[in-house]
Curated annotation (Swiss-Prot):
GO biological process, alphabetically ordered: nucleobase-containing small molecule interconversion; pyrimidine nucleotide metabolic process
Gene3D superfamilies xref list: P-loop containing nucleotide triphosphate hydrolases (3.40.50.300)
Top enzyme category: transferase
UniProt keyword annotations, A-Z: ATP-binding, Cytoplasm, Kinase, Nucleotide-binding, Transferase
Organism: Mycobacterium avium (strain 104)
Name of encoding gene: cmk
SUPFAM superfamilies noted in UniProt: P-loop containing nucleoside triphosphate hydrolases (SSF52540)
Protein name: Cytidylate kinase
One Gene Ontology CC term in the entry: cytosol
EC number: 2.7.4.25
GO molecular function ontology, one term from the record: ATP binding
Compartment list: Cytoplasm
Residue sites binding ATP per the record: G11, P12, A13, G14, T15, G16, K17, S18, S19
The keyword Kinase is annotated on this UniProt entry: yes
Length: 228
């Protein structure tokens, strides 16, 4: 692309958001930032410190004290907590189970939103992925996209990923977790999951990853031309 552009991509888990966002960033020659990884780093720090994720005051203090950084890479960002590469550990089951509770705490979101805005303001185009990018983090982004898919489709995708990774084949348990996470994300008091009024909503239920990336690339080009 000839001009820099900021693309905000939001949506619930299991919509293909991460893989699509990475693919779109590669197609655009843009940087990529997964803001969910930052919430996972704070969650990991909280768990390592033995803090109850429901203790808002203690979690808030931990969020303010944590030292984190993100190393941009075309194949996926690397996440560093106090200088330690925790890119794999933040994707573990314990962090996954606690991240919704931690990310719902206002002090955590305040700290990370500021960091995310700083990262997005750097030179060049960037694709920023999360759950409140178009509504809170980057409300003035010229391109806002909200990915969605049925809970059943998202659970099937996640279960297939688990099986491929050698984990248990348990679709019903995964579906229950998807619905639980949806409820937590959409009803939290601070920055609930929702599409921005000017976001383009894309249902990925019946689309392949390549089809979604191609569609979003066209949307970005169209919106970028309009925004000039």
């Amino acid at each position: 692309m000839s001009a820099d552009v900021v693309v905000a991509i939001d949506g619930p888990a299991g919509t293909g958001k991460s893989s699509v966002s990475k693919g779109l960033a590669r197609a655009l020659g843009a940087r990529y930032l997964d803001t969910g990884g930052m919430y996972r780093m704070v969650t990991l720090a909280v768990l390592r410190a033995g803090i109850d994720p429901a203790d808002a005051d203690a979690v808030g203090r931990a969020a303010q004290a944590v030292r984190m950084s993100v190393d941009y890479h075309p194949d996926g960002d690397r996440y560093f907590l106090g200088g330690e590469d925790v890119s794999t550990e933040i994707r573990g089951d314990k962090v996954t189970a606690a991240v919704s509770a931690v990310s719902s705490i206002p002090a955590v979101r305040t700290r990370l939103v500021g960091l995310q805005r700083e990262m997005a303001s750097g030179p060049g185009s960037i694709v920023v992925e999360g759950r409140d990018i178009g509504t809170v983090v980057l409300p003035d982004a010229p391109v806002k996209i909200f990915l969605t898919a049925s809970a059943e489709t998202r659970a099937r995708r996640r279960n297939d990923q688990n099986v491929a990774a050698g984990l248990a084949d348990d679709y019903e348990a995964v579906l229950a977790e998807v619905r639980r996470r949806d409820h937590l994300d959409s009803t939290r008091r601070v920055s609930p999951l929702r599409a921005a009024p000017d976001a383009v909503v894309v249902d990925t239920s019946d689309m392949t990853e390549a089809q979604v990336i191609d569609h979003l690339r066209d949307l970005v080009r169209q919106r970028s031309e309009v925004a000039r």
